[in-house]
Amino acid sequence: MHARLLGLSALLQAAEQSARLYTVAYYFTTGRLLWGWLALAVLLPGFLVQALSYLWFRADGHPGHCSLMMLHLLQLGVWKRHWDAALTSLQKELEAPHRGWLQLQEADLSALRLLEALLQTGPHLLLQTYVFLASDFTDIVPGVSTLFSWSSLSWALVSYTRFMGFMKPGHLAMPWAALFCQQLWRMGMLGTRVLSLVLFYKAYHFWVFVVAGAHWLVMTFWLVAQQSDIIDSTCHWRLFNLLVGAVYILCYLSFWDSPSRNRMVTFYMVMLLENIILLLLATDFLQGASWTSLQTIAGVLSGFLIGSVSLVIYYSLLHPKSTDIWQGCLRKSCGIAGGDKTERRDSPRATDLAGKRTESSGSCQGASYEPTILGKPPTPEQVPPEAGLGTQVAVEDSFLSHHHWLWVKLALKTGNVSKINAAFGDNSPAYCPPAWGLSQQDYLQRKALSAQQELPSSSRDPSTLENSSAFEGVPKAEADPLETSSYVSFASDQQDEAPTQNPAATQGEGTPKEGADAVSGTQGKGTGGQQRGGEGQQSSTLYFSATAEVATSSQQEGSPATLQTAHSGRRLGKSSPAQPASPHPVGLAPFPDTMADISPILGTGPCRGFCPSAGFPGRTLSISELEEPLEPKRELSHHAAVGVWVSLPQLRTAHEPCLTSTPKSESIQTDCSCREQMKQEPSFFI
């Protein structure tokens, strides 16, 4: 179906552009220079679309700089995207990376085609409609060009909506009947709007620009009041509202993740009233009713009726959530329930059709191809191991500024990371995205090499893992605590220290079923202690855990601690679990088996209330303080670790600690006092 839809899109685009060029030549050959120059001027916004397409090609790492530039200068950049997507879709057996590339190619193509249709086809449609009406329907060339432009613009809207829907997790196949109803809906609404504006221009000329400008301002203020969160920057958000307000002069597009029934009804009611007023003024119906005026008004408004009927049929019968939508409308009309609660996420129809998907996108784990990884930046495993912390941060920033990340937000109609995380989930199958800045061939080669050279985490050299982390990344982690995830450990440099492994180097993606937090043990003055790593999960708090036991005999001198960092990268909704850092050393006391042993709140001693520890001053140690020598009396191979996990989105800053208890468990009787328990086993949340 991908190939057929791409073929239909290419056929409509070829017909529309051929008719447009023939119309320009027709005007110049017949001596109608004004219309010829106006039709030629409409082609100028196409250079903006070609420039954007070229930049996106370069952002994707496409080779061939000179040839690519020449194609875009000749206005063939969108056609090249058609060709690439067609070649990819015609492959009989698409592997996961190819399916991922096909979906990204289709998303880029649909967005560029919609932009080209709005900038070129829309003005050309208005111009040719006016020329065709001014000639009293006798000039065939403008009429044919009007028909193709009308169909092409409507299909661009349908194609954009369809491909954006494919980027959502759990998407369902859209039948041809649904596409046909959407095409009728778009053509009916668009035709009525264009005819109303053109007829009003024939009667009042440039006053139509006042009407269009007033409609633009009203729609822009309405968009501002709706508070769409797709764009984060304030300046870009205002520009986005202005551009969408201009689009709303002709057609409607939804940019909100909430049910849009009320918004759509409001928009089309306003459009209907405007069209009726424009038609009444254009046909002089108020001055005296005539049969011709009635025919004109009825003919124009019949398109609105056809579009409305097609819209109702699509959302009541052919939409994946049509059952919920229809039942919600009935409940609201009967007064049983109101509001926008009709489009629930777990609809019966969507559940029944979930197993009947006929189209899907690539997967890196199995036969289920859902584009859930599009909402997540590349993991540190996709970055070369020799790259430092700065390289990984640059990769994450490039992903968040990449245009494919914009498609994710437009598909889900939100820029809220929490909502994107909830939509894509943690365990849904996904295809592995290409590394940004690499071409498809380079990505496939790198993926094959990485699969061959991948070794188990237990066989990795700890010294290599420690050297791969850069010390200069610490200020970055401190300056940006809300968007980074860092693991910092301090280990003493003893000669006979047991080999340890950097926990962050073997991080994987956690699941909701894994453990609560990453726990790291710390050894103070004494002879026993150990370090254990737990599994991590998504959390909006920072968990710090330490264990210390008082000893009586130890004469070893401690050396200055060394700092080890491993940046795990920004994860959208997933924390990376910390694996066990070292084997259990012989002779060290075991870590407490239950949470009650390490919590001053869950203890059963005489002082079970939370008592602030004297060793916790409520501030973060500086680098100079961390580099000071440890206490003189320490056992060999003693080390302390601090595990810090920050997941997006962060709900509170690092300057606002949240003190709470550890997860509840059965209390174990202890006979130590509150002060001794706080000194030996401090555990708290930051």
UniProtKB/Swiss-Prot annotation:
InterPro entries: XK-rel, XK-related_scramblase. The lineage of its organism: Eukaryota, Metazoa, Chordata, Craniata, Vertebrata. The keyword Aminoacyl-tRNA synthetase does not apply. Residues 450-468, 490-509, 550-567 have a biased composition (Polar residues). The chain crosses the membrane at residues 33-53, 205-225, 239-259, 265-285, 297-317. Belongs to the XK family. It holds the Pfam family XK-related. Signal peptide: none annotated. It comes from Homo sapiens (Human). It comes from the Eukaryota. Residues 340-359 have a biased composition (Basic and acidic residues). It is a multi-pass membrane protein. Its main location: membrane. GO terms for cellular component: membrane; plasma membrane. Residues 339-387, 448-468, 490-592 are annotated as: Disordered. It is found in: Cell membrane. Residues 523-536 have a biased composition (Gly residues). Keywords: Cell membrane, Membrane, Transmembrane, Transmembrane helix. This is XK-related protein 5.
